[in-house]
């Protein structure tokens, strides 16, 4: 079974059209991976679907790196 980290990276790769190998935990969605605000909304929705959780807007705004997404899912998502 894939880890949360692997699943998050796979979703990021699919949503942002980047190679999964290029995605580092410290990668910034906006600065390093080329996401824009619409990409971020779609990414949050994909994470919510995958991990059966709801990410409030005020929390979603704080998720700017891959590691922050992983940490949030570890704390709030269904494994």
UniProtKB/Swiss-Prot annotation:
<comment type="pathway">
    <text>Lipid metabolism; fatty acid biosynthesis.</text>
</comment>
<keyword id="KW-0596">Phosphopantetheine</keyword>
<keyword id="KW-0275">Fatty acid biosynthesis</keyword>
<feature type="domain" description="Carrier">
    <location>
        <begin position="2"/>
        <end position="77"/>
    </location>
</feature>
<keyword id="KW-0444">Lipid biosynthesis</keyword>
<dbReference type="InterPro" id="IPR006162">
    <property type="entry name" value="Ppantetheine_attach_site"/>
</dbReference>
<keyword id="KW-0597">Phosphoprotein</keyword>
<dbReference type="GO" id="GO:0005829">
    <property type="term" value="C:cytosol"/>
</dbReference>
<dbReference type="InterPro" id="IPR009081">
    <property type="entry name" value="PP-bd_ACP"/>
</dbReference>
<protein>
    <recommendedName>
        <fullName>Acyl carrier protein</fullName>
    </recommendedName>
</protein>
<keyword id="KW-0963">Cytoplasm</keyword>
<dbReference type="InterPro" id="IPR003231">
    <property type="entry name" value="ACP"/>
</dbReference>
<dbReference type="InterPro" id="IPR036736">
    <property type="entry name" value="ACP-like_sf"/>
</dbReference>
<comment type="function">
    <text>Carrier of the growing fatty acid chain in fatty acid biosynthesis.</text>
</comment>
<dbReference type="GO" id="GO:0000036">
    <property type="term" value="F:acyl carrier activity"/>
</dbReference>
<dbReference type="GO" id="GO:0000035">
    <property type="term" value="F:acyl binding"/>
</dbReference>
<comment type="similarity">
    <text>Belongs to the acyl carrier protein (ACP) family.</text>
</comment>
<dbReference type="GO" id="GO:0016020">
    <property type="term" value="C:membrane"/>
</dbReference>
<feature type="modified residue" description="O-(pantetheine 4'-phosphoryl)serine">
    <location>
        <position position="37"/>
    </location>
</feature>
<dbReference type="GO" id="GO:0009245">
    <property type="term" value="P:lipid A biosynthetic process"/>
</dbReference>
<dbReference type="Pfam" id="PF00550">
    <property type="entry name" value="PP-binding"/>
</dbReference>
<keyword id="KW-0276">Fatty acid metabolism</keyword>
<keyword id="KW-0443">Lipid metabolism</keyword>
